[in-house]
Amino acid sequence: MNNFKKRAGGPDIIRVLATLLVMTTHSIAYLGPMNVDIHTPKWTAYLVVRFAALSCVPLFLLLTGYLNRKKKLEKGYFRGILPVVISYLIIAAFSVICTNIGGHTAFGVADSIRSVFDFTANGYAWYVEMYIGLYLLIPFLNILFEHLGTFRNRMLLCIILVCMTMLPAAVESFRVGGVALDIIPEYWEAAYPLGYYFIGAMIGEYQPKIKKRYSIPMALIAILIPSGLCWLYSSPEAGYAWYMMNGFSCITTGAMAVTIFLVLYDIEPPKPVAAVFRELSTCSFEMYLFSYPADLFLYSQTSYFMPFMVLTVFAMSYAAARVMRLVMVPLVYRRLKGR
């Protein structure tokens, strides 16, 4: 009961915000092809919103490092991944049924089973695939973090990881004579989750404070630089400039996510507000996966103002996640425990 009372409100707010931002990025993708002329007022606004929403996955990863930096390699640790796996299996099976009924994809029995285990049953399951691997590594990452010992050593690790995993995407965005500036090795770019994990661990360990008057300008700069450059480099003839700082593994996205995290992580909202965010945060993983069938259904039926669509998907996903957590997950756990 004491742990419940002491639960911080900031991480719950971050998790709910990240869930909303995920749904926002998907909404923009469903509302139209990005190869349209983005220089119209509507698509210019969508472009800025999209770059802001790219902080969604980095926020989740920062939060993982922030909350898990003390986890140790001990008995029972690896059982902790079971809720994630069980939730995924249930929602993946539900997604297969929905895609077959809705006519989006025709799966046979064998293909349906295979799609669950190769993480293609749910279009957003790549995150589950990534998170399982990260979870298995967490105790070992924490050993490294702990034995580095000093702030200087830990900061040096974070700087090296940022240079290896986030800087290449920014540098190669610029082109001379149509040739990308691949002057920084990009081999380790896919390891960006490690960079975010350790940055989150640093924030949790040292609890840095950011002056609020600086946070908004910093976040705006991190949003407007990549979105402005993407706007300039895109054209109706050449299409959308996908190469221009698009993605989670870009230093501008990282700067934006870290700024948002630093603003929110130590917030303590009033108890009624904290209770709402706690409830939504508890269901956020399932909401993320349930948003896939919700997106398929909603965007195949209609297309309204984007905020309305995002909030509708959010509400549908929460309802589905709450039903699953109240009914299906307890039944599965009782089976596993032989009750």
Positions of the model-derived regions?
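Alpha-helical transmembrane segments and terminal signal-anchor/GPI-anchor hydrophobic tails
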Residues: A190-P193, P208-A275, Q301, M306
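Hydrophobic residues within membrane-embedded alpha-helical segments of Major Facilitator Superfamily
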Residues: I14, L21-T24, L59-L61, Y196, ...
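Membrane-interface helix caps and helix-loop-helix hairpins in membrane proteins
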Residues: F117-A125, S173-E186, P236-M244, Y304
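Helix-helix packing/entry segments at the starts of transmembrane helices
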Residues: A274-Y292
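Juxtamembrane "helix-exit" motif on the non-cytosolic side of transmembrane helices
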Residues: L31-V36, N100-T105, A169-V179, G228-A241, ...
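Specific transmembrane alpha-helix
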Residues: L54-K72, Y127-I143, A170-K211, S249-P269, ...
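Aromatic-anchored segments of alpha-helical transmembrane domains
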Residues: L20-S27, I91-I97, C158-S173, L220-S235, ...
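Membrane-cytosol interface segments of multi-pass membrane proteins
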Residues: M1-L167, T302-R339
